[in-house]
A protein has these predicted regions:
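Bacterial N-terminal signal peptides that target proteins for export
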Residues: 1-10
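Active-site beta-strand-loop-beta-strand hairpin of nuclease catalytic cores
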Residues: 80-105
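Short amphipathic alpha-helical segments that mediate assembly, nucleic-acid/protein binding
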Residues: 26-27, 49, 120-124, 139, ...
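Bacterial N-terminal signal peptides
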Residues: 9-19
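Acidic-basic catalytic patches of nuclease active cores, encompassing PD-(D/E)XK
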Residues: 25-83
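Non-catalytic C-terminal interaction segments of nucleic acid-processing enzymes
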Residues: 165-219
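Catalytic cores of nucleic-acid endonucleases
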Residues: 99-101, 106-173
């Protein structure tokens, strides 16, 4: 009997789900959220959940119930309520483990989808929601975990570079303090204005090796 790819993905996702549940029986809310994604009729959500659980399975010491504060929840309402329905994937208890970011977002996009994010309003609104959330003080408090089987990390960094170039003003103004950790392009100090930020993202030397993209991880 030939098994379809979609059926295989569902079975694999359930295997990862059951493995995680076995280690976190006391956390019924977490289990419910994972199950909703694993069994979703939405293929993108289902594959994203599979990618998340696959990453959990590869890094069991990182993704323990003690380290995870919450799953798949709406962002706290910001001052300007950027995106009322935007959600995050994982919120860590980084007081328990300060080596962890505060948030992780799992994306299982292919190369073609990544190439379009600079014009995707929903994607940009979610990204801005992460930037403005209480507790996010620098870019290291955030991690986007991509599926390396579907896209190359340099392609994804290039896509985020386009996001910054095409949406410079709104992204900077969402949380100007985040960008203060990075040097000005002329080497005279740290970024402390929109002009400094524009100068950086528009400079010919600004490429995917810049530390501004270190929040993008591949699994």
């Amino acid at each position: 009997m030939r098994i379809s790819n979609s059926f295989y993905i569902i079975i694999l996702t359930l295997c990862f789900f059951l493995s995680f549940v076995a280690k976190a029986e006391e956390s019924s809310f977490f289990n419910q959220k994972i199950e909703e994604g694993a069994l979703s009729s939405n293929a993108a959500m289902r594959e994203g959940t599979q990618h998340m659980l696959s990453t959990f399975n590869k890094n069991p010491k990182k993704y323990t119930p003690e380290n995870i504060e919450n799953f798949d929840m709406k962002f706290e309402k910001g001052l300007d309520d950027i995106c009322a329905n935007c959600r995050y994937d994982v919120k860590f208890n980084n007081k328990q483990n300060p080596n962890l970011p505060l948030f992780e977002e799992f994306k299982s996009y292919n190369s073609e989808t990544w190439s379009k994010i600079a014009n995707d309003k929903g994607f940009i609104q979610q990204f801005k929601s992460y930037l403005q959330t209480s507790g996010v003080k620098n870019i290291d408090d955030l991690a986007y975990v991509i599926n390396s089987n579907k896209a190359n990390i340099n392609e994804v960094k290039q896509a985020f570079k386009e996001v910054l170039k095409r949406n410079t003003d709104e992204i900077f103004k969402t949380n100007p303090n985040i960008w203060k950790q990075f040097d000005r392009v002329d080497g005279t100090g740290k970024i402390n204005s929109l002009k400094n930020f524009k100068d950086l993202v528009e400079d010919i030397s600004f490429d995917t090796k810049h530390p501004i993209f270190n929040f993008i991880k591949a699994e």
